[in-house]
Amino acid sequence: MHQVSKFFSALLITVTGTTAPSLAGDNVILETVRAAESRLGGRIGISVHDTGSDERWDYRADERFPLSSTFKPFACAAVLARIESGAERLHRVVEFEEQDLVTYSPVTETRVTTVGMTIAELCEATITLSDNTAGNLILESLGGPSALTDFMRTIGDMTTRLDRWETDLNEGTPGDKRDTTTPHAAAQSLQQLLMGPTLSAGSREQLTTWMENDKVADALLRSALPEGWRIADKTGAGGHGARSIIAMVWPPASQPVVIAIYMAENDASFADRNQAIAEIGAAIVETVGN
């Protein structure tokens, strides 16, 4: 794994302007998180699970952080579960009007004068481009934010909660428990939905495909992956320095690694927050690749 080690060092030189620090063994992930937290301020929480070795790395993993747009794969998983039960149809057309549009809706704002969008198109838009109106329409199809919370409880997640709609849910006020999760809960739920028995094989494949096609995440974990590694992910961002990503990563010829990274309560720039996640991603590659 010498090539990955060199890749990790090169990435840190690129994103920080310094050589990779001397970090011991498995602590490379946690030390990288602590260094990023010290530099950015606020809090960073992670939960990483190598499903092949069953090793875990947690830091502030049971502290609450704003969900932001990381709720979107969970919402679409709830839709897929409803489709399996016969309560929804993937190709049902949802009509909407200009008054339904909210900030950052790159797909739905171009379709508002058409006959609407299918449930499948809405999930694709809200996961791959983080379209906020599409996210709201998916939530509406479920019965609102509380219905997503109820779904999370059915899969064993007693922590994650959604209370508001886009874009209010991105407020991220420190200490506000609304619209929050913990890194541990988010990682476990993602693993359950992409690998567990909650969804059928076909639904798991569909959710994975949507997340693999994420088009707004290149500067984060994807920038840290060597050639041949696969990733399915979803990012989030909000007020008070909130930035997040949930992901499943497949090293070549290995079992997947589940990752949840959340940050909050900092004054760092958007680019600096992205850089920190890329650094943590490089540390994860360095650790699980050995």
Can you describe what each PLM-predicted range is?
Residues T51, L90-V107, L142-G143, W210:
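Acidic helix-start/capping segments at beta-turn-to-alpha-helix junctions
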Residues A81-D100, P145, T149, S200-R204:
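Short, well-structured active-site flanking segments
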Residues D54, P66-V94, T126, I259:
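Active-site SXXK
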Residues R43, T118, C123, N136-T198:
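Mid-domain, small-residue-enriched loop/turn segments at the edges of structured enzyme/sensor domains
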Residues K6-T18:
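Bacterial N-terminal signal peptides
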